[in-house]
From Swiss-Prot:
The keyword Membrane does not apply. This is Small ribosomal subunit protein uS4. Gene3D superfamilies: Ribosomal Protein S4 Delta 41, Chain A, domain 1, RNA-binding S4 domain. Pfam families: Ribosomal_S4 (PF00163), S4 (PF01479). SMART domains: Ribosomal_S4 (SM01390), S4 (SM00363). Keywords: Ribonucleoprotein, Ribosomal protein, RNA-binding, rRNA-binding. It comes from Campylobacter curvus (strain 525.92). SUPFAM superfamilies: Alpha-L RNA-binding motif. Residues 98-161 form the S4 RNA-binding domain.
Length: 208
């Protein structure tokens, strides 16, 4: 299944949760979910009772859409998490957080992961001094992630940094906003990652 590219606000309303897909509108309280916190359609305000399988599937969809990845990529990450020692769900979240597009977003250089992905694919991002244009590139602890020199005054990047100054930066990155670079200092603990996803249902789904 390909990565979702449809109307993001309708998707958020269908799933009933903000997926950080419309950063600036969400921060301003102007997203469709803020205005109409129910599913789209004639009967949207009457949410149907969801089965256990439906709940498991919904949590997987939320994670895929939030991080902007395909079913194939998601399954591959889950399989890697399952092979490692430790809590599979927490390890899955950790692997998702290590994606370069997500790290660019977490450092505040983009208001959404979708825009962060564009910055990466269009060659605006360096990792440890080398240009990397692969959104799924895994950022290791201690890595330096920065905006290339000619893009440091990009209005969208500057605007994103201004907006994230209001919301704050996560604790596992150190960012020099003026110089447009950051250090991915460590992998986050699961409780630090504030996302509307219950990954235990994803583990149950893939463990069948």
């Amino acid at each position: 299944m390909a990565r979702y590219t449809g109307p993001v606000e309708k998707l958020e309303r269908r799933l009933g949760v903000s997926l950080a897909l419309k950063g600036e509108r969400r921060l301003a309280g102007k997203s469709a979910l803020d205005k109409r916190p129910y599913a789209p359609g004639q009967h949207g305000q009457r949410r149907a009772k969801i089965s256990e399988y439906g709940l498991q599937l919904r949590e997987k969809q939320k994670a895929k859409f939030m991080y902007g990845i395909s079913e194939k990529q998601f399954r591959r990450l889950f399989q890697e998490a399952a092979r490692r020692e430790g809590n599979t769900g927490a390890l899955l979240v950790q692997l998702l957080e290590q994606r370069l597009d997500n790290v660019v977003y977490r450092m505040g250089f983009a208001t959404t992961r979708r825009f962060a992905r564009q910055l990466v694919t269009h060659g605006h991002i360096l990792v440890n001094g080398k240009r990397v244009d692969i959104p799924s590139y895994r950022v290791e602890p201690g890595s330096k992630v920065e905006v290339i020199e000619k893009s440091k005054n990009n209005p969208q990047i500057v605007r994103a940094i201004d907006l994230t100054a209001q919301t704050g930066i996560v604790g596992w990155v150190d960012v020099e906003k003026d110089k447009k670079f950051g250090i991915f200092t460590r992998n986050p603990e699961r409780e630090e990652v504030i996302i509307p996803i219950e990954e235990r249902f994803i583990v149950e789904l893939y463990s069948k």
